[in-house]
């Protein structure tokens, strides 16, 4: 199959359990919860989405004809030693496109593979790190993984709803926007009262990196 990719770039992971880790980000175009167009935001399941995943016009974006071509492009962005190679497959919703062929091609190039997903689509085998970020009002299909990262607060997505699921780590991330200070204070308070949850902040935004 071919892959529609918005952008590919090397950066430090800015949030969640792998914050601070060198990572190649591969952002896939398209999502099943929102078109990505502002005109449709009010009809989106996640109206707070802050990511541009529309089209293929970003850095190294395009339609890749094969898993090998895409994996080679990702590998070319890794400028350090061959140790600790890490790729984050994100979106949009990456599981609309990620398949066995791409997973095999990335593993063959020495990458540990992380995926950031809204959890509404079953994940293929072979992913090394599954981070699910549930969206209120959507059906959660992926009910186990390595990390559940909840943007907080969210209507229809209270943290206690997810505490019994089979995840190794639970992260609470303050919702960005005009009320970020209040949301951060609320998230801190929640984590203090419910230590199963760890605070996740978007460090890449404060550092000015992608």
Swiss-Prot record:
Binding site for S-adenosyl-L-methionine: 92, 133-135, 173-176
GO biological processes: queuosine biosynthetic process
InterPro entries associated with the record: 7-CO-7-deazaguanine_synth-like, Aldolase_TIM, QueE_Cx14CxxC, rSAM
Cofactor(s), by name: [4Fe-4S] cluster; S-adenosyl-L-methionine; Mg(2+)
Keyword set, alphabetical order: 4Fe-4S, Iron, Iron-sulfur, Lyase, Magnesium, Metal-binding, Queuosine biosynthesis, S-adenosyl-L-methionine
Binding site residues for Mg(2+): 51
Chain sites annotated for binding [4Fe-4S] cluster: 31, 46, 49
MF terms (GO), sorted A to Z: 4 iron, 4 sulfur cluster binding; carbon-nitrogen lyase activity; magnesium ion binding; S-adenosyl-L-methionine binding
Taxonomy, superkingdom: Bacteria
Record family assignment: Belongs to the radical SAM superfamily. 7-carboxy-7-deazaguanine synthase family.
Subunit structure: Homodimer.
Protein known as: 7-carboxy-7-deazaguanine synthase
Organism: Bradyrhizobium diazoefficiens (strain JCM 10833 / BCRC 13528 / IAM 13628 / NBRC 14792 / USDA 110)
């Amino acid at each position: 199959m071919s892959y529609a990719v918005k952008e590919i770039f090397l950066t430090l992971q800015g949030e969640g359990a792998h914050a601070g880790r060198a990572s190649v980000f591969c952002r896939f175009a398209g999502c099943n919860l929102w078109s990505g167009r502002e005109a449709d935001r009010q009809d989106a399941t996640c109206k707070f989405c802050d990511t541009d995943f529309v089209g293929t016009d970003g850095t190294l974006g395009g339609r890749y004809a094969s898993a090998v071509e895409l994996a080679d492009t990702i590998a070319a962005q890794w400028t350090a030693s061959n140790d600790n190679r890490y790729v984050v497959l994100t979106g949009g919703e990456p599981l609309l496109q990620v398949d066995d062929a791409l997973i095999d091609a990335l593993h063959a190039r020495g990458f540990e593979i992380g995926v950031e997903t809204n959890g509404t689509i079953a994940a293929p085998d072979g992913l090394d790190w599954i981070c699910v970020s549930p969206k209120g009002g959507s059906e959660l299909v992926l009910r186990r993984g390595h990390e559940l990262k909840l943007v907080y607060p969210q209507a229809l997505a209270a943290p206690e709803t997810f505490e019994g699921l089979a995840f190794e780590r639970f992260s609470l991330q303050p919702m960005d926007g005009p009320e970020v200070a209040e949301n951060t204070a609320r998230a801190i308070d929640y984590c203090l009262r419910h230590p199963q949850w760890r605070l996740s902040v978007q460090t890449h935004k404060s550092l000015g990196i992608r």
